């Protein structure tokens, strides 16, 4: 099988990596015209 690492995250405190890797977040920022700090 595939090797993987399971990590639990508190979704109330999203990591910078998660925010950077989330294309929906990027699209929302683009469409809404907000800075990432505001869109959280």
UniProtKB/Swiss-Prot annotation:
What other remark does the UniProt record contain for this protein?
Answer: On the 2D-gel the determined pI of this unknown protein is: 6.2, its MW is: 27.1 kDa.
Originating organism: Zea mays (Maize)
Highest taxon of source: Eukaryota
Report the record's disulfide bonds: none
Q: Hey, which family's this protein in?
A: Belongs to the GST superfamily. HSP26 family.
Q: What's the protein called, per UniProt? A: Unknown protein from spot 207 of 2D-PAGE of etiolated coleoptile
């Amino acid at each position: 099988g595939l090797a993987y690492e399971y990590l639990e995250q508190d979704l109330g405190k999203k990591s910078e990596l998660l925010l950077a890797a989330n294309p929906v977040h990027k699209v929302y920022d683009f469409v809404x015209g907000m800075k990432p700090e505001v869109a959280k």
